[in-house]
Design a protein with these regions (language model features):
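Aromatic-lined ligand-binding clefts that engage carbohydrates, nucleic acids, or primary amines
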Residues: 1-24
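Domain-level detector of nuclease and nuclease-like folds
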Residues: 18-143
């Protein structure tokens, strides 16, 4: 089902079909999904964005130039994540955790954001355990 909008400005979604890879659910009501900043804004702030210009913070929040930065996910799953990092929260679907950790690392690299010790430990555990041997294409730097 293609996404349709309420007007030509493409600001408000009327209908569509979205797959939430965090929990494996598919939705047809826009009200059932949120657009998730994979690295939440507060997490980015705490990891270095507090020293950025307002323009760079806006670019991060609206980063449409990199496919992994923003995702449509089930609304209550996104709410449960809040501003948590991977040491505090992982997708409920176990098979999504490797991709989530990979996306997290790539986004932090792209935006030159730091990773705290607990976050690093959890990411290393995920990426060296259940993920197996994966190659990550280094994303272009955003700043």
């Amino acid at each position: 089902m293609p996404v349709t909008f309420t007007s030509s400005s493409h600001c408000t979604v009327k209908s569509g079909r979205w797959y939430s890879w965090y929990d494996g659910r598919t939705w047809t009501l826009a009200s059932d999904v949120d657009i998730d900043d994979v690295v939440a804004l507060k997490e980015a702030w705490d990891s270095g964005a507090k020293s950025w210009s307002a323009t760079d913070r806006s670019r991060f929040h609206n980063d449409l130039g990199y496919a992994w930065t923003l995702d449509a996910v089930t609304d209550n799953v996104n709410s449960s994540k809040g501003d948590s990092d991977p040491a505090q929260w992982l997708p409920p679907l176990a098979s999504a955790r490797c991709a989530y950790a990979t996306h997290w690392v790539a986004i932090k690299y792209r935006w030159r954001l730091s990773i705290n010790p607990a976050e690093k430990t959890k990411l290393a555990s995920i990426l060296s355990g259940t993920c197996g041997a994966k190659t990550l294409a280094i994303p272009p730097r955003a700043r």
